[in-house]
Each structure stands twice: as C-alpha cells, then as structure tokens.
Regions:
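Alpha-helical transmembrane segments of multipass membrane proteins
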Residues: 31-36, 59, 107, 149-153, ...
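Short alpha-helical transmembrane segments in multi-pass integral membrane proteins
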Residues: 1-17, 75-140, 181-231
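Hydrophobic faces of transmembrane alpha-helices in multi-pass small-molecule transporters and flippases
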Residues: 4-32, 59, 63, 134, ...
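Small-residue-rich hydrophobic transmembrane alpha-helices
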Residues: 49-113, 144-166
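Hydrophobic positions within alpha-helical transmembrane segments of bacterial inner-membrane proteins
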Residues: 24, 28-31, 102-110, 145, ...
Length: 231
C-alpha cells in the first residue's frame, strides 16, 4: 500500500533547503541594494543599472547551479557507496570546474561589460553605472562557485546544518552588513565595493572549511565497510 515515508521526505527537504536559501538570499540582497541606492544622488539611474546587472549576473549563477546539480548525485553516489577515492576525485573535479566556470564568466563580463549593458539600455549614464556595477559584482565571482560547491558537498556528507550556514554567508551574513553601511559612507562607490568585500570573506570561510569537509567525509566513509549496510 502507498504511504508517505517521512524519513525520505525529511531527507529531500533538508537537501533542498540550502539551495532555496541561496535563492532567497539573492533576492534579499537585490532588494537591499535597491534600498541602499534610493537615497543616493542619481538613484533612479543607479537602480536601473543595477536591474540590468542582476539579469546578467543571474545567468552566470544559473550556469554554476546547473553544473552543481549534476555534481551532487555523483558525489552522493560515491559517498553512499563509501568509495573514498571516487568521492574526493569528484570533489576535486567540481572545485576545479566551478572555479573555471566562474572565472570564465567573470572575464567575459569584465571585458564586455559596456556592450552587455548596451544590449539592455542605451542611456549613457545608466551604461556607465552598469558597467562598473557589473565589474564589481563579478570581480571575485569564483567566491560564488566555491561557496555553492562547498554547500552542496556538506549536504552530501550529511552535514546539512553547516551546508545551510554556508548557503547564507555570501549574499546574507556578509553582504547585508556591507550594503547597509558602505553606501551611507561612500555613496555609489560603497555599492561597488560591497560585493567584493563579501566575496573576500566568503572565500576565507570556504577555504577554512575544506579541511573539516575532508575529515568528516573520510571519517563517515571509513566508519562502515563497503557493503556492510547490505548485510
């Protein structure tokens, strides 16, 4: 007979929450940036430029997210099979690939910042604000790839609580204080520097988390021999 498996529902929910939190943080960060820009001189043009930039940045985000959705089942299978070598191999591949993808996106956006903004708006003032906003948003864009990869990996190894924490740091815990304070002190320049400042802290936290991820995953996979759960 059909009946819901609450354990399975809980597992699926826990796995999906960090990704949902990242999306929520992106939306909150966008709203707070508009609020921070509102009191500034020429606010209308800044907000219009930021709207264009967000569309472009989200394209890059979706590319990375799509790749990570492919990485997660591979890493999960290796972890569930307690194949330590394959798991760490998949982690290394995902790390390199996510960094490569985000670096490529950043390079393209920085080099083509002006033409890309012109695709959406031809107002020279908006184009000028937009190109600098776009450069500032992707200057340290690998932070997004690294953070999302670490979030997915911590989910995979069962440390969903820490994965949830990582999902909040880039556009939440770190970005929000900067976007609420820097524009008040430095005007539009404060908006330009808010994302790079948050990305620097994100990279530091993620780098410090790699060691514990390796220890937790290795300890979990070595705790029960392969095939023991089938006995």
């Amino acid at each position: 007979s059909f009946h819901p498996s609450w354990k399975l529902i809980k597992t699926v929910t826990v796995i999906g929450i960090p990704t949902a939190v990242i999306q929520i943080c992106l939306s909150v960060a966008s709203s707070l940036t508009n609020i921070a820009a509102a009191p500034l001189p020429d606010a209308d043009n800044i907000i219009a430029a930021y709207g264009v930039v967000q569309r472009l940045v989200l394209i890059g985000c979706y590319v990375v997210m799509g790749f990570m959705q492919g990485y997660q089942p591979v890493a999960s299978f290796a972890f569930g099979a307690r194949d330590e070598d394959r798991f760490h191999q998949s982690v290394r591949f995902a790390l390199k690939a996510s960094l490569l993808l985000t670096v490529l996106v950043a390079v393209v956006y920085i080099l083509l910042s002006r033409p890309l903004i012109l695709l959406f708006n031809q107002n020279p003032v908006i184009v000028d604000y937009g190109r600098w906003l776009l450069v500032s948003q992707v200057a340290l864009y690998p932070a997004f790839g690294l953070c999302y990869m670490m979030t997915i990996t911590y989910q995979t190894i069962g440390a969903s609580g820490y994965g949830l924490f990582l999902s909040t740091i880039r556009q939440g815990l770190f970005y929000v204080p900067f976007i609420l304070t820097l524009p008040k002190l430095f005007g539009v320049t404060g908006i330009y520097f808010s994302q790079p400042a948050a990305d620097i802290l994100t990279i530091l936290v993620c780098m410090l988390s790699i060691g514990s991820m390796k220890r937790i995953s290795s300890a979990s996979m070595r705790g029960t021999p392969k095939g023991a759960d089938e006995l």
